[in-house]
């Protein structure tokens, strides 16, 4: 097992870094080049430690800068050179193995058995350097690598000479040691992270240094690391020792002019127990390239790849401290106890009430909450779900600044300097905290809003709550987007226009606040853009703009009253035919939701309808239609970059569409706030053609009669209209009906009063005196509202014929019923107020002749219904009996066991005649008339000419009729009372009653249950039965004709 540990001692603040992992005394070279670092060879007399590396932090040198002062790592208890007490020692200890003498000898002479340590700095920026710009870039050189074998017995002077002569690779200083001996003030460098990568190299033993440099080397993979932290002071160039170094450095690109801190955070990656073996394929950046293609020199780390990886990382103090450090894996050999960590005093972080903070919970995540209460050592946090929790300050983190979390583990700890919170509250809408702006604080949640960023704030309203807290569980009320013209001249917008978040083309902002009114809108629909402030304004809110524009018609030069000293500047630009077609296709696409439009069916009618409103010259408006059509066709062909012909997409060539679905391009006219607008400026500077101003008389006549725009209707993108399609016609119909009713009332007053119909009942039967009911003329496509209105109109007209005046005894005067208030009851029920009045059309001759001797009043009406027809010689009509219900007798089973219905033939000539009380027959005009009834009756059979009587075949009778004939007797042809006038026989009476009420045998055939309760015989021999029909207590006496 491998054990990696390090020691950190605090007797003296370390100032320098070196890598002497091989002990070899050397003499300093007085005339050494500028300060560098290098490897020191191991003495030949000592037994080398197998795979052991020591990393030291050296103090500043004492004496001249040219004198090299070195410290050596201890590999045994006896050493001749002192070891500085302030060291960080990283030891890679593998299990000691007993090797044979031959292997031991080979190990001692192998130059690459010892580990090479490379320091790779991933810090993307250096915060401050007290160096001029020309020296700053030369101080930190690109990443370089240099590997030096342990064998060969080279001295320090030889190594320095080797590095200076360029035999090996030119070495660069480590990131902590700048290459200079300048006596300028010490430079300050802040490094976020340093990865120490341990590479093990295994090659055969070369005999000389030159041969070892040309041998291909195979680096081992980087050992998985556990991060530990240590605070190291920065190193000044004036205290650097002179030696050779094989470390790497990263040049920094960010500089600032002030010094911030004197400590750097160094993160040492320590391997864990899952260490890979040397035989594992290499995963280091230098192993990406193939060993066979590598140069004889040792593999290098590319500067570009490393810098790219450095820039892709986001080293920050918060990210490092957010994750707790993982403790190191317990080693197999017990490591020495680590020294107590050095912790800088963390600055005090204060939190205020109603401040939003992050709280770190047990799951490792941060949750947003608001401080609502505090004690001496705890804070009460309320979360968004209304839950509350007491937290200590070390678990809190400021929303916009640093953190007070102190993390420690593995013998190291870090603290981060926090930024102080802003002095005043911040608006949650615009995320700004300006001193001159007033931020209103919600009383419940503590969130702040500028008065211009929300519409709920009312000045002087006292306690205020935001919309989120005022109605947390209710749906938002629909905001009224009705555009109303503001009163007076607007000199100041009710919102902060500079805080709006606009898109790239400055057409739409995220807040949806526009115009003088601060309400939303659509830039391509009745809105114009100011040429100075570039804000968009509704045409309805402008002072003298009365027109409605087409979608995408923004060819105006407009300046608002805020930018133009209270006067609006509006000028219309003249457009070309290509813009006319673009506007036409853009509107058709918005309204019809189609991409392609036919030239003759869609585009041509639209331009003919709208060409008097489009900004084209008067000559083009008066073009003949043939010339206009030719101009449109030629324009569509010439501008193929804006219009698409249907031929390109396998459509008819008469179809066209926009290549890009946006509105037409408008000339950009933007001016500075101090520039003065004029027509000359627009024509000379921007080369615009302006339309002449329209006279005011046309604007005054416009509201009188505005032609209906057939293309002006709502689309899915437009706001919904509150009025439905049926309400407008209903209102028009109601107004028209009121006018007609008033006219009829005036005519009715001019006509002479008619006598009361109740006093003259002789005229009741006259059809000329009765108003015939007028059927309503209902259209199939009319709505229910129209039907209801017409029916109510009929009711109002018919109610005028009745006497609706109420007396003192009526229910409406007592107020006992609301229905009586709506429909007042009449005074009497005579004449037309009779509820049983039936307006029947009758012939005048019959009415005059029969009405003599009839009673007056209700009796006369009943007699008029059931009176005899003296001259009637008609034959009785054949009426089919009513449909009967299906009974069990009608169901049969076929030969194949299928269920069938029994078919019974019903003869239309089978008429049931029963004897009952003598009443007048019902008039024939109340009975249904069929086509077969209109046929003339068959002529009576006369005597044949051949003198022989033909034998008449008996007619087939129905089962019900045969059953009736077998149980009953036949009736006489005339009544017993002697009233046998022609046409008034009992047969006609019984036939009419049977046709109207239905016969007993029909009811029996229909399956209606019945029971015979009694039987009697009359004096004339007629037998009558008392029949009780199923379920009814009432009985009916039915006379059956017997023999």
Swiss-Prot record:
SUPFAM superfamilies, sorted: FYVE/PHD zinc finger (SSF57903)
Biased composition (Gly residues): 399-412
A single BP term in Gene Ontology: negative regulation of DNA-templated transcription
Keyword flag Transcription regulation: yes
PROSITE patterns tied to this protein: ZF_PHD_1, ZF_PHD_2
Alphabetical keyword list: Chromatin regulator, Chromosome, Developmental protein, Metal-binding, Nucleus, Phosphoprotein, Repeat, Repressor, Transcription, Transcription regulation, Zinc, Zinc-finger
Compositionally biased residues, Pro residues: 324-344
Phosphoserine modification, residue list: 805-806
Main location: nucleus
Pfam family, one: Mtf2_C
Biased composition (Basic and acidic residues): 737-757, 793-804
GO cellular component: cytoplasm; nucleus; polytene chromosome; Set1C/COMPASS complex
Stretches for region Disordered: 1-34, 271-302, 317-346, 395-422, 737-819, 931-985
A single MF term (Gene Ontology): chromatin binding
Composition bias, Low complexity: 25-34, 807-819, 955-977
Zinc finger annotations (PHD-type) as residue ranges: 424-472, 512-560
Localization (cell): Nucleus; Chromosome
Listed PANTHER family: CXXC-TYPE ZINC FINGER PROTEIN 1
Assembly, per entry: Component of a form of the Esc/E(z) complex present specifically during early embryogenesis which is composed of Caf1-55, esc, E(z), Su(z)12, Pcl and HDAC1/Rpd3. This complex is distinct from the PRC1 complex, which contains many other PcG proteins like Pc, Ph, Psc, Su(z)2. The two complexes however cooperate and interact together during the first 3 hours of development to establish PcG silencing. Interacts with corto in vitro.
Role played: Polycomb group (PcG) protein. While PcG proteins are generally required to maintain the transcriptionally repressive state of homeotic genes throughout development, this protein is specifically required during the first 6 hours of embryogenesis to establish the repressed state. Component of the Esc/E(z) complex, which methylates 'Lys-9' and 'Lys-27' residues of histone H3, leading to transcriptional repression of the affected target gene.
Protein name in UniProt: Polycomb protein Pcl
Gene this protein is translated from: Pcl
